Amino acid sequence: MINGTALILGALVTLVGMPQFINYFRVRNEGQMIREEGPKWHQKKSGTPTMGGMVFIIAIIIASLVTGVIFHGAKVSLLMLLFVLVEFGLIGCWDDSIKLLKRQNEGFKAWQKLLGQIIGGLIFFLVIKETGVALQLNIPGLGIWHLGGWYALFVIFWLTGFSNAVNLSDGLDGLVAGLSTIAFGTYAIIAAHQQNIPVMIFCMAVVGSMLGFLVFNHKPAKIFMGDMGSLALGGALAAVSILLNQELSLILIGIVFVLETLSVILQVLSFKLTGHRIFKMSPIHHHFEMLGWSEWKVDIVFWIVGLIGSIITLISIL
């Protein structure tokens, strides 16, 4: 009942709000500028409405709070997840707004985005520390590592790293929305197993909102989530793993996000050290496009990889 309410509310609010938001951009003749360094055939997407993350963030907030208040009360953990979602979403919103105003694909400077992410991560840590969250990591094969105050650095790194990882992965229609549905759905199952109702409510609200968003974001996308959506989802995903004390599970559940990020790092290092590129283009989803794969094929294969990582995680935890 609780799961269904959060999921349905998230989907309904997104389905109702997104058409109006798309129409707003079309009337103003504004949209996403596509970077010239990407695949040439992506240029036809230029002008597609963006910042769809604004709608599904609102949908997640409404679905989470309504379901939380009705069934369980708005607990601190639920409010902190919403804080991370909104704070990281606002960073992306500012970034997207600059791009739209300048009509180019360059927004925030890297240090400005990083500063906002660090502040968000630090606030999240300070609050969860007071709620009694264990400041430790359960590392398979190595046991439990008690980090104490050093856990703050881990939290900041985790939220910042995964928000940027999801952001890097958002280069194909429907890719991140599908992967996020799988990842948050997996954490909803883990939260239910732990009887952590607030986190379960939040995760199901995200799943519902993502399913609603996919109606408009599948190829050919009628709207993009923008940095507002991808940064918010990545930060929230990391925060969920922390509140469930399953931080390192995100490496498998979010395996595609990890691989996308590693492909960029390896590409840059290889080119600087040897003058040669490992991939035809990075992030790695573009590499497969350059090999002749359609966007749908990349989406489906990457979704399957994400699903396999999630299934392995569930088998090991439950």
From Swiss-Prot:
It is a multi-pass membrane protein. InterPro entries: Glycosyl_transferase_4, PNAcMuramoyl-5peptid_Trfase, PNAcMuramoyl-5peptid_Trfase_CS. GO terms for molecular function: metal ion binding; phospho-N-acetylmuramoyl-pentapeptide-transferase activity. Disulfide bonds: none annotated. It catalyses: UDP-N-acetyl-alpha-D-muramoyl-L-alanyl-gamma-D-glutamyl-L-lysyl-D-alanyl-D-alanine + di-trans,octa-cis-undecaprenyl phosphate = Mur2Ac(oyl-L-Ala-gamma-D-Glu-L-Lys-D-Ala-D-Ala)-di-trans,octa-cis-undecaprenyl diphosphate + UMP. The keyword Transmembrane applies. The chain crosses the membrane at residues 2-22, 51-71, 74-94, 114-134, 139-159, 172-192, 196-216, 223-243, 251-271, 298-318. GO terms for cellular component: plasma membrane. Keywords: Cell cycle, Cell division, Cell membrane, Cell shape, Cell wall biogenesis/degradation, Magnesium, Membrane, Metal-binding, Peptidoglycan synthesis, Transferase, Transmembrane, Transmembrane helix. Its EC number is 2.7.8.13. Its cofactor is Mg(2+). It is found in: Cell membrane. One of its GO terms (biological process) is cell wall organization. The keyword Cell wall biogenesis/degradation applies. Pathway: Cell wall biogenesis; peptidoglycan biosynthesis. Catalyzes the initial step of the lipid cycle reactions in the biosynthesis of the cell wall peptidoglycan: transfers peptidoglycan precursor phospho-MurNAc-pentapeptide from UDP-MurNAc-pentapeptide onto the lipid carrier undecaprenyl phosphate, yielding undecaprenyl-pyrophosphoryl-MurNAc-pentapeptide, known as lipid I. Belongs to the glycosyltransferase 4 family. MraY subfamily. This is Phospho-N-acetylmuramoyl-pentapeptide-transferase. It comes from Pediococcus pentosaceus (strain ATCC 25745 / CCUG 21536 / LMG 10740 / 183-1w). The lineage of its organism: Bacteria, Bacillati, Bacillota, Bacilli, Lactobacillales.
